[in-house]
């Protein structure tokens, strides 16, 4: 393979990464979120969502309604939680939400921060679920939970780039 072919492959790879990054940033701006896509990591929302489903989020709604499926983050915890709004209270300044997983027996009070009885929509909510793709996100779960799968996948990608003819 000559230098021109190698440069062409490198530029094509750069184009793919730049396009993916621009698509991600466009989705972020349109949805008003830093992360407009999340993967379901547990079975707490079954049967609505299964582990490995990809969820598309939106954060341009003024208020949440009872029954909306929301994604929220708790201070001190790194993993976002996907649950349904069970109860809501609001006044002119803020909206407070109580959530619960469809497959859970009790509400999420035990998941919230200490001395927190409700989620504050402005501070805790990441977004509202507007759509999903079933099971496509399962690859990310396999990569994060299985070290051998991660290294095997990286090895295959490396080998394919070494032996490609284009």
UniProtKB/Swiss-Prot annotation:
It comes from the Eukaryota. Keywords: Endoplasmic reticulum, Hydrolase, Membrane, Protease, Signal-anchor, Transmembrane, Transmembrane helix. Its EC number is 3.4.21.89. Residues 152-163 are annotated as: C-terminal short (CTS) helix. The keyword Transmembrane applies. InterPro entries: LexA/Signal_pep-like_sf, Pept_S26A_signal_pept_1_Ser-AS, Peptidase_S24_S26A/B/C, Peptidase_S26, Peptidase_S26B. Residues 1-9 are cytoplasmic. Pfam families: Peptidase_S24 (PF00717). The active site is at residues 44, 83, 108. GO terms for molecular function: serine-type endopeptidase activity. It is a single-pass type II membrane protein. The chain crosses the membrane at residues 10-30. GO terms for cellular component: signal peptidase complex. It catalyses: Cleavage of hydrophobic, N-terminal signal or leader sequences from secreted and periplasmic proteins. It is found in: Endoplasmic reticulum membrane. Residues 31-166 are lumenal. Catalytic component of the signal peptidase complex (SPC) which catalyzes the cleavage of N-terminal signal sequences from nascent proteins as they are translocated into the lumen of the endoplasmic reticulum. Specifically cleaves N-terminal signal peptides that contain a hydrophobic alpha-helix (h-region) shorter than 18-20 amino acids. Belongs to the peptidase S26B family. Component of the signal peptidase complex (SPC) composed of a catalytic subunit SEC11 and three accessory subunits SPC1, SPC2 and SPC3. The complex induces a local thinning of the ER membrane which is used to measure the length of the signal peptide (SP) h-region of protein substrates. This ensures the selectivity of the complex towards h-regions shorter than 18-20 amino acids. SPC associates with the translocon complex. This is Signal peptidase complex catalytic subunit SEC11.
């Amino acid at each position: 393979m000559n230098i021109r072919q190698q440069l062409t492959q490198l530029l094509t790879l750069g184009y793919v990464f730049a396009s993916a990054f621009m698509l991600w940033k466009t989705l972020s701006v349109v949805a008003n979120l830093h992360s407009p896509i999340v993967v379901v990591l547990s079975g707490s929302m079954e049967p609505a969502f299964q582990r490995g489903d990809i969820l598309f989020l939106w954060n341009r709604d003024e208020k949440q309604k009872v029954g909306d499926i929301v994604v929220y983050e708790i201070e001190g915890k790194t993993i976002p939680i996907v649950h349904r709004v069970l109860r809501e209270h609001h006044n002119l300044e803020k909206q407070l939400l109580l959530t619960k997983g469809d497959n859970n027996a009790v509400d999420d009070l035990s998941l919230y921060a200490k001395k927190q009885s409700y989620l504050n929509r402005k501070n805790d909510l990441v977004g509202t679920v507007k759509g999903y793709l079933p099971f496509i996100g399962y690859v990310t779960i396999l990569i994060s939970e299985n070290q051998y799968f991660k290294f095997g996948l990286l090895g295959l990608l490396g080998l394919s780039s070494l032996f490609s003819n284009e």
